[in-house]
């Protein structure tokens, strides 16, 4: 970018590159931008008034950059060229600045000389501002108040130097002459601070520390250390953008690699510093950060950062004492052995070379707020205030911060301070296979596991989350030895891993073959101790446990030896390392296990798992309402009291596990845990009735349909977790009862984070609907495996909307196979996915053989002319289709000709979209011939092509002989006034046309006014 921008010579070229220049000016730190201003001021490109307007504190950097471009533009070619020179000078900041030109310490114009030599003087003052302030104050040139204003801790050393020079420019008491004389006497600037031995020593120590922490992966396993380098597998990392910002041709979210994390595209707030990575529990967020740390520490990537400071939110919340930014970085991450002040000052002066990572905001018990502002890097404050001000940019502005979290913990307020949001969606199909092959290099083992997973639909759906792939890997022997009864639900998987750990801890000669009564009874006390610890931890938002907390829960060394508790990295140097569960989901599982089997758990107290007061009107606030005993009071310290305090997203996971444990399938296991038959039946019956009742209550809250429209339901927050809980119980009769009276025509589940596992749960419940429904699952993570999981419920679907779901040709073929057997399924929307010509045969078969099919939308995929030709053959045999969407593909003229030839004779097609398909005049000519013959088409969308005037001439001729088309859309097609004139002539003979869209074509303002006045149907 730099070379292309710096080659510009005219104002027109300068203006054409404006967006690149803005990106260049804001790509570095505020220090870099202010250095550019120094050069422009020293060359008199900027007046003092210009400079002050561009240096207003608190202005977003992007705003200042645009104002600077406007200012130099108004100064002509010379100003534009000088800006580019200033950018080059500021970027070449590694050389030693020298005071240049004549230098008269007794100059008659000291203020002018200070300005002429400003870049060099700022650099020379860098390490001497404090000394210069003292000299100036003692000499009577500055007041104490003025010195304190310059010393404010929010300013860097360079900014303090600039403020001193700015003050000298307006004071008439000789300060400018004083500075000229004393700056000349200062020693030449030292090499840049990060080249100094002290900084290099700290960087080396920091790299070593980060490398030590990131080399081995022990997130899910305490019994062995796995080398991250050997087993790391890329996850699906998608860039989240605001829906609709890219118009009709908006593509699916970009899938990025880890190395793309800091790219400049997809900004939600360009002036923010924080990159947010969201993902469900077990999707691999912590491992992704660990990989980032490893790549930096080994020098293979992210070397634009000199410093990386990694933090865990679950450990930060354990810090009780007030702390400053300096304390956080040095005492809670890495301590500089020498020159602590110099190192810290460098961090403040060069925040753009610093990266801070904060893992697991969802495990931070304090909710984000912007009410308490803290801008001092040296004054102590609470840990939550420090973290929140770092994320907002009030501290270490322009330092990059990467934050991970589960989605539910991210508020709209926090998103205001997010520069880029990315979603971690777990493994792709290829990722699952690669992960298992990396874990099992023995001949044939990985192949057998992969075959087992692919043959077991429910297990396949679970494995897209890395935590489940890890479980499958750990339990591969148990899975491969089983001939039936493979895990179906999340609860099944966690019971399988429980069995694996129990068997591993048992003597070899006494180990039973499965998770039988004897195995559970032998370690029941351990499981209850772990469950009690887990439940109390959830109540206090505590995920790292001290020795005192372990003792209070009666967890001893024998319990720890089972392997579910592992050592956490100590957040306080020198203290004994605390323990944590392998993963937050294990903590939730053990809490649910405790609630299911503990003799202390009353039936009434289970209600509080689902009706935590803070959930308000959400799903969980209405779940299990009839468990409440009127007039009962919550006993302090009881399970009910503990559950009232737990975080909602952890309650959701715990609720699903509890439903699974109370299922009929696991009744014998709970009985083996010494739960009486009567108590067990009570808990199961209550859970079943309340789950069904809660879902009905959820459905009853749906407002009535608008007269003349289908009754629609948009899922409320938490609805998916209610469905998951029903699925975990695996009782068909319960699912049937839950939806028996649901009376809707459209079920909308957009942006609900629906993956393959959620698809299985939805299908399990929705297959029992009494009336057909249109199912909308846009903007989720269904994928090909999720499509497979939806099979059971497709028979009750009239329409299926799967926009932006990472579906490939394989998933499309599955859908077609089902649609051909499902009489009621009449509409498919698969735009913004990964379809290619390879699925065209299936689509053609669907059109040819399903004569009640109404709508097929496959826009924004990767279909070419070859695919369009195949699909056209299927359309030739179809008589029912009304809507065909092909926008955003690459069918070109050849594909358009094939489609047009078939559409010409179609008797029912009402709407055809070929937006953005690289269609030229030949394709337009074919469409014109189609218009002459077709008697049904009402809307033809051809925006974003290159039809131009020649193509419009053909279309105009077609319009003269057409009497049904109402809307013709030709925006952004390179059409001139001559083409519009041809359309006007056609319109004079066509009264059926209501609108012709011509926006974005090559008309002058006068031509637009003329054309609009001649026919109002032209939309310009």
UniProtKB/Swiss-Prot annotation:
Query: Mind listing the UniProt keywords for this protein, alphabetically?
Result: Adaptive immunity, ATP-binding, Autophagy, Cell membrane, Cytoplasm, Glycoprotein, Immunity, Innate immunity, Leucine-rich repeat, Lipoprotein, Membrane, Mitochondrion, Nucleotide-binding, Palmitate, Repeat, Ubl conjugation
Task: Specify the CARD domain's residue ranges.
Answer: 6-104, 106-200
What kind of modification does the protein receive after translation?
Answer: Palmitoylated by ZDHHC5; palmitoylation is required for proper recruitment to the bacterial entry site and hence for proper signaling upon cognate peptidoglycan detection. Palmitoylation promotes localization to the cell membrane. Palmitoylation protects from SQSTM1/p62-dependent autophagic degradation. Polyubiquitinated by TRIM27, leading to proteasome-mediated degradation. Polyubiquitinated and degraded following muramyl dipeptide (MDP) stimulation, conferring MDP tolerance and preventing septic shock.
On tissue specificity, the annotation reads: Expressed in monocytes, macrophages, dendritic cells, hepatocytes, preadipocytes, epithelial cells of oral cavity, lung and intestine. In intestine, highly expressed in ileal Paneth cells of the crypt and in intestinal stem cells. Also expressed in neurons of several brain regions including the hypothalamus.
Q: Name one GO biological process term.
A: positive regulation of autophagy
The reply to whether Phosphoprotein figures as a keyword in the UniProt entry is no
**Which sites bind ADP?**
219, 232-233, 282-287, 583
Q: Which SUPFAM superfamilies match?
A: DEATH domain, P-loop containing nucleoside triphosphate hydrolases, RNI-like
Q: Give the LRR repeat ranges.
A: 685-709, 726-749, 766-792, 794-817, 822-845, 850-873, 906-929, 934-962, 963-985, 1005-1019
Q: Where in the cell is it found?
A: Cell membrane; Basolateral cell membrane; Cytoplasm; Mitochondrion
InterPro entries in the record: CARD, DEATH-like_dom_sf, DNase_TatD-rel_CS, Leu-rich_rpt, LRR_dom_sf, NACHT_NTPase, NLR, NLRP_HD2
Short motif (ATG16L1-binding motif): ranges: 43-57
GO cellular component terms attached to this protein's record: basolateral plasma membrane; cell surface; cytoplasm; cytoskeleton; cytosol; extrinsic component of plasma membrane; mitochondrion; plasma membrane
Ranges where the record places region Required for CARD9 binding: 221-254
Q: What Pfam families does the annotation carry? A: CARD (PF00619), LRR_6 (PF13516), NACHT (PF05729), NLRC4_HD2 (PF17776), NOD2_WH (PF17779)
Q: What does the UniProt entry list as the effect of changing residue 485 to V? A: In strain: NMRI
The keyword Ubl conjugation appears for this protein: yes
What does the UniProt record note about how this protein's activity is regulated? Answer: ADP-binding promotes an inactive closed conformation.
Instruction: Give the UniProt family note.
Output: Belongs to the NOD1-NOD2 family.
| PANTHER family (UniProt xref) | NACHT, LRR AND CARD DOMAINS-CONTAINING
Describe its partners and assembly state.
Homooligomer: homooligomerizes following muramyl dipeptide (MDP)-binding, promoting RIPK2 recruitment. Interacts (via CARD domain) with RIPK2 (via CARD domain). Following RIPK2 recruitment, RIPK2 homooligomerizes via its CARD domain and forms long filaments named RIPosomes. Interacts (via CARD domain) with ubiquitin; inhibiting interaction with RIPK2. Component of a signaling complex consisting of ARHGEF2, NOD2 and RIPK2. Interacts with ANKRD17 (via N-terminus). Interacts with HSPA1A; the interaction enhances NOD2 stability.
Q: What does this protein do?
A: Pattern recognition receptor (PRR) that detects bacterial peptidoglycan fragments and other danger signals and plays an important role in gastrointestinal immunity. Specifically activated by muramyl dipeptide (MDP), a fragment of bacterial peptidoglycan found in every bacterial peptidoglycan type. NOD2 specifically recognizes and binds 6-O-phospho-MDP, the phosphorylated form of MDP, which is generated by NAGK. 6-O-phospho-MDP-binding triggers oligomerization that facilitates the binding and subsequent activation of the proximal adapter receptor-interacting RIPK2.
* Entry note about domains: The ATG16L1-binding motif mediates interaction with ATG16L1. Intramolecular interactions between the N-terminal moiety and the leucine-rich repeats (LRR) may be important for autoinhibition in the absence of activating signal.
What is the name listed in the Swiss-Prot or TrEMBL entry for this protein? Nucleotide-binding oligomerization domain-containing protein 2
